[in-house]
Amino acid sequence: MGECIVLAENLTRRFGEFTAVDHVSFEIHAGEIVGYLGPNGSGKTTTIRMLLGLLEPTEGRATVLGFDAFRQTEEVRTRSGYMSQKFALYDDLTVYENLAFYAGIYGVRSKSQILETLNRVGLSGTEQEITRG
């Protein structure tokens, strides 16, 4: 088995009284091919978003490629790739955070470029609004 490249220990995420992810722990080692399966609403996307530093866990810790997923988010994101099964806005992120996330997939990290894009499409001033999907 190769080195551990993803480590999740007791990852938990609650939204109010609802527990979306409940103390999930696993390891992924270099060279492994992994399928992360489960029914709709089982917490798969929430877990992936925590591993990418897009969503902070209520409890637990995770490392990706040796970086703390919650304290070294930029290092994790620049070394990771993620594509959603279908395009959708994340309803708990702001307009800016949603655009920055998808822009980052394509290597665009410039805040000024993202803000200019918002201005160009008439969304200037909405950067901090939650999208609500």
Segments (PLM) and residue ranges:
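Conserved ABC ATPase "signature" region
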Residues: 100, 104, 111-127
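Helix-to-loop junction immediately C-terminal to a conserved catalytic motif
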Residues: 52
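Walker A (P-loop) phosphate-binding loop of ABC-type ATPase nucleotide-binding domains
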Residues: 39-43
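Short coil-to-beta microelement around the adenine-binding A-loop and adjacent beta1/P-loop entry
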Residues: 18-19, 74
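Conserved ABC transporter NBD signature motif
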Residues: 60-68, 75-80
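Short hydrophobic beta-strand immediately N-terminal to the Walker A/P-loop
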Residues: 34-36, 48
